[in-house]
Structure formats: C-alpha cells, structure tokens
C-alpha cells in the first residue's frame, strides 16, 4: 500500500518539472535549463536543492596586537616593572664590562715582547752547516737546521756578519753592506731563510757594523780620490810621511796595537782606523754618512729582519781636536807605547754625541715597528765598558735607545766560583735602570768557549744558571752540547789564531767532519772530541748536556716564575750560589742551588731561609737520576758542577721579608691571579 503511494509521489514530482542531478552536470547548468517560473504552473511539489560547496577562508599573517591594546597592557605594573629592571640590568652590565676591560688594561703589566719571551741563539754562519759541499757554512745550511733550533725552544736566531767582505777580521771589514758574501749564498737565499724562520714562528736578528768599512768599499775608494760627496766620508788628516816612515797626527792606537793612523799614497794623507788598517773609520760628524747608515738599516728591515746587534758603537765618534790620549803609565817612554791597553781612551770612545747617533738609529728602526707584532729589536755590543757606561745604552725613560746592551759578564769569567758568579750577577742587576730588561750570555765568537775556559764539569750548571736568571738567555751555537775550543797551531787564514778557537764547525754527528759538511775539507778543523760530543749522540742520552738544555728551555717557557718573577739572591761562598724565583699569586717558589767550586760541598739551607721546609722536591737537576726526589734542607749535598732547582711553597715570599728585600730584583712588577688567570701590576 505504501509502495504504491511512493510511486505515485515520484511520478507526480516528475510530471511537475522537478529535475534531478545525475552527478555529471553542475547544479548551475541545471538551473539555467529550468523553465521560466512564469510558465511553470504553481504546485505544491517540494524542490530538493543540491548541497553547496564550502567556501575557504583566507588566512592572513598575524599583524600583532593593535596599538591601542598594546598601550593598554604595557602600562600595567606587572609588565612595566620587569621591563625596566631588565633594561637597567643590561645598561649596568655593559658599563661593568667596559669598566672591567679598562681596569684589566690599566692594571695588567705590558706583555713581554718576543725578544724577552724566550732564548736567543747566536750563529757564526761559516761554522754552522754547509749545504753546498765547499767546506763553509752558509745560509741554506742554517735553513736546513731550523727544526733543530725549534726543538731547543729557541725564539730568536742571531746571525753574525755575512756581508760581502775581503775576509779581514771575520767579515767585519765590509765591502758592501747590501750584498751577501758569495761564500754564504745569495740575496735570494737570505730572503728564503727569513721566510722560513718566520714560518717557524721565530725571529731573526743580524749583526750590523756602522763604525767602519773595508778599504775595498766604493765609498773609501772614492774618498781616496776626493770624489764629490765622498771626500769627507772618512777621517783624514795631514801627516808626515818620509822614507817609508809615517809620523801620525797624535798618539792614538788601534785596538790591535800600534798607531791608528795609516798613510794613503793616493790621497797623501793619513786616515784613521780604530781596528785593522783595512778597516777605515767612517766620519760620523758628516750628516751624509749618517743618512747612508740609516738607508742601510732601512734596506735590511725591508727584507724582513726583526732587529740588529749594533757592533762597536762606542767607537762611532772621536774628539775633534786630536789631543793625545793619556798614558796609563806616565813614566813609560811615549815612543814605546804601542799596546791599546797602555792608553786611557778618553778621546776615541764614548764621545759626546755618540748616544745621539744610537738614538737616531733607534728612531729609524721604529719606523718599521708600528705594525702589531713587528717590533724591531736593537741590541748594542759594548765590550770593555764600565758598568756605569754600559747601562747608559738602555736609554732613558723618555728617550729610547737599545732594548739592552749585550751582557758578557758571565762569558768573560775565566775562573768560576760562587763569589765570581755572584759578583757578575749583582754588578748588572744593581746598576740596571729601573724597568729595564736584563740578558745573559755564557759564550760568544770573541771569547773562548765555556768548556775550554772553565771546564766541561760546569757546562750544565752554567746552562742552569742561564735559564733561571731573570731576563733573556743567549746561547752561542754549540754551548748546548758543551763544545770546546779547537787546538790549532798553523792556519792559512789571515786571522789571529786565538780568535778562531771558538769558531770551529758545529758537531752534528760522529760521521766524517762531524756532519758539518760532505766536502773533503772544512774551513776550520773540527774538534777532535766530535765522536762523543755531538747532537745525535746526546739526543739519546738522558744525562747529556743537550737533554738538560731542552728541559731548562722548556721550563723557562712554561713557568711564569722564571719569565716574570722576582729574583732574590740569597747567599754565595767560594763554592755555591743560592737564589730564588718567586711571583705573588703563585703558591710555589723555585730555590736554585749551584756549585761552582772545585770540589763537592754541603749546604744548610735552614741557615739561609729560616722558614724553608725540611724536605724539598727536586724539580730539575744536572744529575737526571735525582729528578723528582727529595732533599734534606739541613744538608744539601752538591758535587762539583752540580745544580738543583728545588720547588716548595712559602706563605710569605722573600721579597716581602725585610731581611731579603734589598737582595731581590724585578724588571716589571707583576702579580698573578689564579681566579682570573691573568697578571696584574697593581700589587
């Protein structure tokens, strides 16, 4: 019954124009096909609309809180107060950081320059390493051995004279200041060496001899003929010359003896020479000569060298009036005075104006020191000067001169004892101007080697002294292995035999010619002990001089006590020297005990330092077997030439104690903060 009714309704809807969507036609199309409603008779049929598609809403980015709402909330106390607190905390923090930075800069001591921070290594280039098999050391040979030098913890290489020279006075008679002597290589070799040295993080300084030139120098040859500006480049004076005999203008003597005046046949005058007659002195009262020397300084600095050792600077000026110098022995017949030591050299050395020249050289070097990390070092050689005169080379607080004059007091000691070492140390430290930096040498090319001068037993103790004294340690090549002088009696070289003894070839190994060269000959003979005293052998020996040297240089590099600390010289006797190294803020002290006597000795350190502990640990010893063990401070036993570095802690450092205050020295006062891990000077 119901089914019949549904069928009738469906038919009725169809008959009255109801349209259905079959799923393939859009509703809009169906509506367009609908008959006009006016033509369609009204009916009560129900029309079922199709479902509409949902419309998507466009989502816009969040534009933030409206300004009016923002102001409404921002003014509330719960937001305003935290905001203001954070703002002022930020401001205060910024000012605190700025203030702390400024304070650290103000209170921190000046950082050590490169020439202060580590040891220097002096090389006589003809004797270090031969690279081209001609029996002579050269620049390439030095470059080949840079790894060895680096392994010694060296920071600066110092090369002695390598300028073009006719071989007089070990190349200190320079024929051309801007050329490399061919025996050492070429300018390109030098440039390569400079680059290699800097690549290793090292610095390079070279010798410079401004006082004189070779008589082969073009300047002198032109001066002999009175050619233009060169006429007065040297010191000329009228003199009498007859029958091969010269009567000089005065009694001035050469360092090597006899008159310092030499007659020249070309110019018919005498020229002045403080050294050999082949080394005429330049006339530094001529401004043109001063400018020439400055140009030479600039030339080598532009090549990349990091500094100079200025040689023989006390001879730069002489008195104008040529007065005779006073005899040491006034009763001696004047004609018999021929030795340099027989006169007081008041008119030929350290004249007024000489230091002005040195300061002028310093200012020229400063033109190349303006770049960060490129400070140019200046050292001066001042042999045989009094301590007071030597210290003048440091300059003044407001006038810069040398960074330091080279200290050869230890290098010239012929007799070792506790007293002589103590006097050599105190004579420098007590006279050095405040704030200046000391340096120490135990050998050099102009002195006999340490082993031959005082004995091989003291090599280790002297190296320990070198690295534990305040200041810059300077090592002459071969001293790290205990090389000695050679024994020679007859040489073809045109030199004083005694001056050659400390210049023998470096002893690298026990092969032919000590590994110095592959040639069949060497310019000087090697030392006969090279089979046992050489680098290769000592590398493998725990008790060797080389191994101790490396340990000492490493300790010096790592310990602020040794580079920045106080030095307190406590006692000396005929055998020993005792001193401490200490620094405020570091809870340890190094107590150094060295025996320079001719026999063993026993020290009671309790008598010297009342509050020293009964037992002290050995940090480093010349006898490696005792390293790390303890010693009884009531009776410290030292063999001949033995040295100990003892480590302990002390509540009140010695430089604060009245009893020792006058015996303590420091160049730049500093204290250490372990909390901040920094040094500061306001202490």
Curated annotation (Swiss-Prot):
Extracellular side: 108-683
Cytoplasmic side: 1-86
Subcellular location: Cell membrane; Apical cell membrane
Disulfide bonds: 239-270, 568-664, 671-683
Record region (Disordered): 1-50
Keywords per UniProt: Amino-acid transport, Calcium, Cell membrane, Disulfide bond, Glycoprotein, Membrane, Metal-binding, Phosphoprotein, Signal-anchor, Transmembrane, Transmembrane helix, Transport
TM region positions: 87-107
Topology class, membrane: Single-pass type II membrane protein
Tissue-wise expression: Predominantly expressed in kidney and intestine. In kidney localized to the apical membrane of the proximal tubules.
GO terms of molecular function: metal ion binding; protein heterodimerization activity; protein-containing complex binding
Pfam families with a match to the protein in the record: Alpha-amylase (PF00128)
InterPro entries, alphabetized: Glyco_hydro_13_cat_dom, Glyco_hydro_b, Glycoside_hydrolase_SF, O16G_dom_2
Biased composition (Basic and acidic residues): 1-10
Positions bearing Phosphoserine: 10, 383
Domain of life: Eukaryota
Annotated residues for binding of Ca(2+): 211, 281, 315-316, 318
Glycosylation: residue positions: 211, 238, 258, 329, 510, 520, 574
Predominant location category: membrane
One GO term describing the cellular component: brush border membrane
Record-level GO BP terms: amino acid transport; aspartate transmembrane transport; carbohydrate metabolic process; gene expression; L-cystine transport; L-glutamate transmembrane transport
Biological function: Acts as a chaperone that facilitates biogenesis and trafficking of functional transporter heteromers to the plasma membrane. Associates with SLC7A9 to form a functional transporter complex that mediates the electrogenic exchange between cationic amino acids and neutral amino acids, with a stoichiometry of 1:1. SLC7A9-SLC3A1 transporter has system b(0,+)-like activity with high affinity for extracellular cationic amino acids and L-cystine and lower affinity for intracellular neutral amino acids.
Entry-linked PANTHER family: ALPHA-AMYLASE FAMILY MEMBER, NEUTRAL AND BASIC AMINO ACID TRANSPORT PROTEIN RBAT
Record's subunit section: Disulfide-linked heterodimer composed of the catalytic light subunit SLC7A9 and the heavy subunit SLC3A1. The heterodimer is the minimal functional unit. Assembles in non-covalently linked heterotetramers (dimers of heterodimers) and higher order oligomers; the oligomerization is mediated by SLC3A1 likely to prevent degradation in the endoplasmic reticulum and facilitate heteromer trafficking to the plasma membrane. Disulfide-linked heterodimer composed of the catalytic light subunit SLC7A13 and the heavy subunit SLC3A1.
Stated name of the protein: Amino acid transporter heavy chain SLC3A1
Taxonomic placement: Eukaryota, Metazoa, Chordata, Craniata, Vertebrata
